[in-house]
């Protein structure tokens, strides 16, 4: 997916984070992998412009997958906010999204993210 500007990057990020969450829950690996690629591409575009702050409002999005991906993208930029968002998801979701948030925190602590 070709991204032309920050607005498109943010839209791409959010849309694909939602898709990725759906695919995580329903097991659609092919579509999930494509959405993952698009999310990473959007993050790279946002990073190139040094505009990570446009992701901060997504830490409070209604969609847990959007919140997890926003936190992932912000872990090295705004660590306290990102970690707080992930910990809240771990506390409030006992399903796959809570597990994903917990694994993201664990991998960050290990230095793998």
Residue spans of the language-model regions?
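Structural detector for internal amphipathic alpha-helices that build alpha-solenoid repeat scaffolds
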Residues: 2-4, 11-15, 26-47, 68-77, ...
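Short inter-helical turns and helix N-cap capping residues of alpha-solenoid HEAT/ARM repeat scaffolds
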Residues: 62-63, 93-94
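Generic ordered-secondary-structure signal
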Residues: 40, 52-53, 63, 108
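Amphipathic alpha-helical scaffolding segments comprising HEAT/armadillo-like alpha-solenoid repeats
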Residues: 3-11, 23, 46-58, 79-91, ...
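Charged low-complexity stretches with an acidic bias
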Residues: 64-88
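N-terminal start-of-chain detector that recognizes signal peptides
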Residues: 29, 59-61
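Hydrophobic transmembrane helix segments
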Residues: 17-23
């Amino acid at each position: 997916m070709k991204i032309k500007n920050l607005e498109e990057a943010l839209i791409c990020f959010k849309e694909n984070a939602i898709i990725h969450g759906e695919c995580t829950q329903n097991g659609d690996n092919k579509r999930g992998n494509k959405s993952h690629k698009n999310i990473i591409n959007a993050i790279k575009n946002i990073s190139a412009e040094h505009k990570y702050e446009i992701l901060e409002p997504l830490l409070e999005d209604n969609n847990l997958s959007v919140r997890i991906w926003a936190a992932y993208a912000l872990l090295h930029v705004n660590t306290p906010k990102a970690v707080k968002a992930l910990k809240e998801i771990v506390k409030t979701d006992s399903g796959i999204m809570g597990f994903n948030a917990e694994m993201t925190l664990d991998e960050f602590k290990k230095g793998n993210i």
